[in-house]
């Protein structure tokens, strides 16, 4: 199989990391727009799908570029390499319509997100990928708290509303790991939201991902950075299923590569995720 170029593979040291963990048997729910689960990059990844808009299993006919791209950043296993290529996909459609760029959040409701979280937890998800951002919702916040209490780790995109924007939800919620985006030179994405709630940063500018109908394309934003971190969390949980949200947050922020001014900051949180260091620290902690 011809491999396609991905700078994130080297930046995240995936060749070395995958000798230690590939996310086997860990269910990661991608709560997003429709996912083309028939894409070669996602072959064999699907565990179950649910369409929160219809109450039925999700259909590949409703696949969208955003959801498909996010799923491939986690699970890709053909010409691309996902962060957790052996993990199991829970494909959760909570947003409808064709997305433009990184704006899938404009076409969903808190109710569909809420149903998606509950469905994912009931299906045994250990990781929730939340690559969307908007206004705070109390019911969704309660659902995230309940999920965390059951050992589920939610990872959320900081948002792409620019440095002057107020913190967006669910990234601003205490029961998620908030992620921002970096380019190949480790510069923060110019339109990423800033804030003290941001935990870590990951590759998120000009990232090659899968697109519907066996296609490929580039995506930029905190969404795909979040998917990279969700994959990392699956790798950690494969190594130790007892990990909870506070432990995962401590592992990620404690091993991240500091960027910018020394210490944690509103631009990049604790810095660039360091998967190898996080896995190594786990073995020391346990």
Predicted regions: what they are:
Residues 1-6:
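Non-catalytic propeptide/linker segments at domain boundaries
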Residues 15, 19, 40, 68-72, ...:
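Solvent-exposed, polar/charged alpha-helical surfaces in well-ordered, non-transmembrane soluble domains
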Residues 16-48, 58-109, 173-175, 193-197, ...:
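Subtilisin-like serine protease catalytic core
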Residues 22, 35, 47, 75-79, ...:
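Sec-exported extracytoplasmic/periplasmic mature domains
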Residues 27-31, 82, 88-93, 121, ...:
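Structural recognition of the beta-strand scaffold that forms the well-ordered cores
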Residues 73, 94-95, 190, 204-272, ...:
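Hydrolase catalytic cores
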Residues 95-174, 187-188, 212-220, 224-226, ...:
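Substrate-binding/access-modulating region of protease and related hydrolase catalytic domains
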Residues 184-198, 215:
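Anionic-ligand binding region
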């Amino acid at each position: 199989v011809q491999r396609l170029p991905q700078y994130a593979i080297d930046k995240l040291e995936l060749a070395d990391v995958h000798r230690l963990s590939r996310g086997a048997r860990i269910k990661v729910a991608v709560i997003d727009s429709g996912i083309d689960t028939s894409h070669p990059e996602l072959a064999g990844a699907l565990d179950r799908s649910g369409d929160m808009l219809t109450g039925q299993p999700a259909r590949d006919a409703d696949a969208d570029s955003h959801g498909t791209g996010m799923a491939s950043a986690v699970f890709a296993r053909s010409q691309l390499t996902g962060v957790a290529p052996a993990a199991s996909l829970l494909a959760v459609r909570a947003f409808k319509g064709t997305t433009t760029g990184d704006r899938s959040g404009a076409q969903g409701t808190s109710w569909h997100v809420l149903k998606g979280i509950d469905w994912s937890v009931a299906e045994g998800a250990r990781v929730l990928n939340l690559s969307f951002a908007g206004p705070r919702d109390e019911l969704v916040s309660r659902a995230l708290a309940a999920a965390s209490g059951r050992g589920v780790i939610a990872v959320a995109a900081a948002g792409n509303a620019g440095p002057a924007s107020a913190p967006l939800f669910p990234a601003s919620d205490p029961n998620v790991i908030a992620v921002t985006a970096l380019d190949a030179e480790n510069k923060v994405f110019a339109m990423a939201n800033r804030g003290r709630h941001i935990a870590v940063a990951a590759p998120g500018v000009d990232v090659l991902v899968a697109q519907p109908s066996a296609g490929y394309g580039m995506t930029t934003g905190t969404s795909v950075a979040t998917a990279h971190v969700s994959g990392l969390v699956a790798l950690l949980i494969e190594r130790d299923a007892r990990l909870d949200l506070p432990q995962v947050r401590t592992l990620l922020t404690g091993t991240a590569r500091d960027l910018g001014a020394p210490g944690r900051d509103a631009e990049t949180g604790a810095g660039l995720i360091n998967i190898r260091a996080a896995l190594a620290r786990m073995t020391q902690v346990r």
